[in-house]
Amino acid sequence: MNEVYVFTSESVSEGHPDKIADQISDAILDAILAQDPKARVACEVLVKTGMVLVGGEITTKAWVDVEEITRHVIKDIGYNSSQMGFDWESCAVLSAIGKQSPDIAQGVDNQQTKILGAGDQGLMFGYASRETDVFMPAPIAYAHRLMEKLAKARKSGQLPWLRPDAKCQLTLKYEQGMPVEVDTVVFSTQHSPDIEHKDLVEAIREEIIKSVLPAEWLNDKTRYFINPTGRFVIGGPLGDCGLTGRKIIVDTYGGMARHGGGCFSGKDPSKVDRSAAYAARHVAKNIVAAGLADKCELQISYAIGVAEPTSIFVDTFGTGRLKNSEIIDLIHTHFDLTPQGIIDQHDLLRPIYRQTATYGHYGRENFPWERLDKVAELSKAL
């Protein structure tokens, strides 16, 4: 690929309303899995001014204090004053949780065969490329790092006027399929009313953006749009309603790869929307790391109650050292993509999900689906 082009991805902060909802959903999931690894959880959250509504379908032997968990997450994010329009101590927490349908349960938990079927039909994508050290597209990887840096600056007191809600958008210029410079940075952060706009712009540019993005990618042509409306005091749930599962592109590949449409947060790993998407990332990353391709996108699909995938598709975008059909044969040989196989391979029945709910589900080495444990076997095919 010799053409010159630009590509844009965005990330949002842990205080973004949709991300508040994702974190509460996954914190409740973690609390349940800590007591009952076989629980069935589909937890959805809505946040708006002064209230949190927790709903969904949960079947479990565990008991968890939904209200306490919800308030703890909001406090941890940093909404600790009514002046922000949202306060962990005073907000209302409403619960509307039911049980999983027995019609779904009988297909997922086959008591005769003891085989775990897929929790629903669906299609999932996994992706990896060589453009960053974590095998992720650079725009989304660096957008997440900008948001992480902002959170650290807020919580440490480095920039005391910061408030929790924020988002950024990063446009990178590519040559020969690799990022070479930053074209545009769009950065909007909630702030206290006493900070001057020019001081905010300088602090974000110098202490956040330039401390994260590679210096060789920044030049006098780089465009910065920092709080371009001039004021962002009203934010969080006071400014916008937040819902679980509305940031699926932020959670995955920033638009660089396709998406099957299912969200992750609040779902136990019997839901292939989540677990199979993680498995697809694991497969794609190991394929690229093994040198079978410089870029790989994988699609897998499932039928409800059926263990084996109904299809596997691979695209290496002309970068493959093997035919796509040969790579699919290797996937069948080296990866168990049944729901139970995925759960066992990645030890997914653990309370590990709250940490995934911010800054992306991929590209961080502490997640088990990021392991490069199949590289040696796959590379033998070259």
From Swiss-Prot:
Where does it primarily localize? cytoplasm
Residues of the region (Flexible loop) are 100-110
Annotated ATP binding sites: H16, D165, A166, K167, R231, F232, D240, R246, K247, K267
Q: Please give the GO cellular component terms listed in this UniProt entry.
A: cytoplasm
Question: What would be an example GO MF term here?
Answer: methionine adenosyltransferase activity
**How does this chain assemble?**
Homotetramer; dimer of dimers.
Q: What is this protein called?
A: S-adenosylmethionine synthase
Name of the gene this protein is made from:
metK
